[in-house]
Design a protein with these regions (language model features):
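Basic, low-complexity intrinsically disordered segments
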Residues: 1-166
Length: 166
């Protein structure tokens, strides 16, 4: 799974979201840090969301094994983006609003496309390190890969075989 870093606007917290299965996953403790709330508050909101039927636990929760600092393995529950957003609406914190805004644009684009581009930053580096040339080189490398090339040839062949010769 990929890790996506989300930094809160106040800069006080950096949350590591686990990207897997077209969504992201967090524990209750990570949600508490994200929304600047207590773990008990997050747990209560999740309990109410499940009891009210707003969320189905089988669809939004999965078990995961993690290794703690002491070397022991522990079972933890992870909650997907649907659960994270639902809790964020109930917590009603400024951080919840910020995260929902970010998740509905940047995160959604990453989960769908596999990448996100900061168009404004790429157009105007303003003294920051400029990675535009690196990005172009990576795109050239992807476009030149054999697999992509042969896929395009197969697409052209399929298209040409659709034409009637008469």
């Amino acid at each position: 799974s990929d890790l996506i870093l989300y930094t809160t606007e106040d800069g006080r917290s950096q949350i590591k979201l686990r990207a897997q299965e077209q969504t992201v996953w967090l524990t209750q403790l990570e949600m508490a840090e994200l929304f600047d709330a207590t773990k008990q508050n997050i747990s209560l909101h999740l309990k109410n969301l499940f009891e009210d039927g707003e969320l189905d636990a089988d669809s939004v929760v999965k078990e995961s094994l993690t290794t703690a600092a002491d070397g022991k393995r522990y079972q933890t529950l992870l909650y997907n983006l649907d659960a994270i957003l639902a809790v964020g609406y109930r917590v009603r914190s400024p951080r919840g609003v910020q995260f929902r805004r970010w998740a509905s644009t940047i995160l959604k684009e990453y989960l769908v496309k596999g990448f996100v581009m900061d168009d404004v930053r790429l157009k105007n580096p303003d003294g920051r390190p400029d990675y535009f040339d690196e990005m172009l080189a990576r795109i050239r490398d992807i476009r030149a890969s054999e697999k992509r090339f042969y896929q395009k040839v197969r697409d052209l062949f399929a298209l040409s075989s659709d034409y009637d010769t008469t």
